[in-house]
Amino acid sequence: MRRGTTPTHEFTTDIDLSTADKIYITYKQGGAVKLEKALPDITVTPTKLIVTLTQEETLSFSINKGVEIQIRALLNNGEAIASNVITTTAQKILKEGVI
């Protein structure tokens, strides 16, 4: 992802999370949680989770360092689940700041 942009992240799931009680998408960099999205900021379909980040949120990531992403959910039957960790990089931009 590029810093200073407003990317939409779509995560495909093999479990229908449309009836989950809680869903969190956590973004971690350098050992610290930088960002966490939760309902209602996440659009949920039977097969996808969709979340859009703001310019401010993507600017909070350090350049060219790994960003770990993980989804956790609490299903309506009380079962807690977690995805594998996804890794991406925050790419640089030439003009810093929000536009």
Model-flagged regions — what are they?
Residues 1-99:
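Contiguous segments within soluble domain cores/interaction surfaces
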